């Protein structure tokens, strides 16, 4: 069988392995706030999102994706880490809430980071203020990840898996159709080599037609010969039959001209030139 189906199957398996590798989970990003998570009203705050090298877009989400902000201004924080910064110049009471990060590294989006809660309070100006000192970085607040919000992601991981299954299914169907086509071609080639089953019968039919024509002409010539007997010959035959004893004698008239011309008439029926009549009688005894 042709090696093409085997090569195509190997190509499909390699493609499936590549897609499966791309489907591996990306590391979760991290989020932090500078100068801290408790910010006086009117002050500034910067959210820092970090992820692996090769991130194309970082997204800062607030309150379970109800509000988000994307940025492609990604810098490399270390040889194995990249980051993006989201700054709020003047914090208001409406800025308080839960924040988390997510990043896009082709061809998929990562999981969400842990939640970070930002608190906004009125500035008291006292030395014992519980505000976070400038320059400090507060860690994220641990909250259970809400997987129900994944439906809003621009690129769904479930769709990627469905695409992989569809690709594998289409490849299997294509290989099956290709196999059927190869089998059909082989079967057709064998039929061409053997020839059609009725070709021999059809070749014999034209050869039988001249034989049938010759038989018809022979029967017609025999009838004409018998009918051409003169009345005297017929009477002689009748008297000979009556005078015979226990044996019966039958006379047969042989027309040499008719016998010699049968084949010629079958080949060229237009030749009607009369020839000398030659008749021979033969006595046949019937017991």
From Swiss-Prot:
Coiled coil: none annotated. The keyword 4Fe-4S does not apply. SUPFAM superfamilies: Immunoglobulin (SSF48726). Disulfide bonds join 49-101. A motif (ITIM motif 1) lies at residues 249-254. Phosphorylation at Tyr-251 and Tyr-281 activates it. May be phosphorylated by LCK. N-glycosylated. Residues 1-21 form the signal peptide. It is found in: Cell membrane. The chain crosses the membrane at residues 166-186. Expressed on the majority of peripheral mononuclear cells, including natural killer (NK) cells, T-cells, B-cells, monocytes, and dendritic cells. Highly expressed in naive T-cells and B-cells but no expression on germinal center B-cells. Abnormally low expression in naive B-cells from HIV-1 infected patients. Very low expression in NK cells from a patient with chronic active Epstein-Barr virus infection. Glycans are attached at residue 69. One of its GO terms (biological process) is immune response-regulating signaling pathway. Interacts with SH2 domains of tyrosine-protein phosphatases PTPN6 and PTPN11. The interaction with PTPN6 is constitutive. Interacts with the SH2 domain of CSK. Binds with high affinity to extracellular matrix collagens, the interaction is functionally important. This is Leukocyte-associated immunoglobulin-like receptor 1. It comes from Homo sapiens. The gene is LAIR1.
């Amino acid at each position: 069988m042709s090696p093409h189906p085997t090569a195509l199957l190997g190509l499909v398996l390699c493609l499936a392995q590549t897609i499966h590798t791309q489907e591996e989970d990306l590391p979760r990003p991290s989020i932090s706030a500078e100068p801290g998570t408790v910010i006086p009203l009117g002050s500034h705050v910067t959210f820092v999102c970090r992820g692996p090298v090769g991130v194309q877009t970082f997204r800062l989400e607030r309150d379970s994706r109800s509000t988000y902000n994307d940025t492609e201004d990604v810098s490399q924080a270390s040889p194995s880490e990249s980051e993006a910064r989201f700054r709020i110049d003047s914090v208001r009471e409406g800025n308080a809430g839960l924040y988390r990060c997510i990043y896009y590294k082709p061809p998929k989006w990562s999981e969400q980071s842990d939640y970070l809660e930002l608190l906004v309070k009125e500035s008291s100006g006292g030395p014992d203020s519980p505000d976070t000192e400038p320059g400090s970085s507060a860690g994220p607040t641990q909250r259970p990840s809400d997987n129900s919000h994944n439906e809003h992601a621009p690129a769904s991981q479930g769709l990627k898996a469905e695409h992989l299954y569809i690709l594998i299914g289409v490849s299997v169907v294509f290989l099956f159709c290709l196999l059927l086509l190869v089998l059909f071609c082989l079967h057709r080639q064998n039929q061409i080599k053997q020839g059609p089953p009725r070709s021999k019968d059809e070749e014999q039919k034209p050869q039988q037609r001249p034989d049938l024509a010759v038989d018809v002409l022979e029967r017609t010539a025999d009838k004409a010969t018998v009918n051409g007997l003169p009345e005297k010959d017929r009477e002689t035959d009748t008297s000979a039959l009556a005078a015979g004893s226990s044996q019966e004698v039958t006379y047969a008239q042989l027309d040499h001209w008719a016998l010699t011309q049968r084949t010629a008439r079958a080949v060229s029926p237009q030749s009607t030139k009369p020839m000398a009549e030659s008749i021979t009688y033969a006595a046949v005894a019937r017991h």
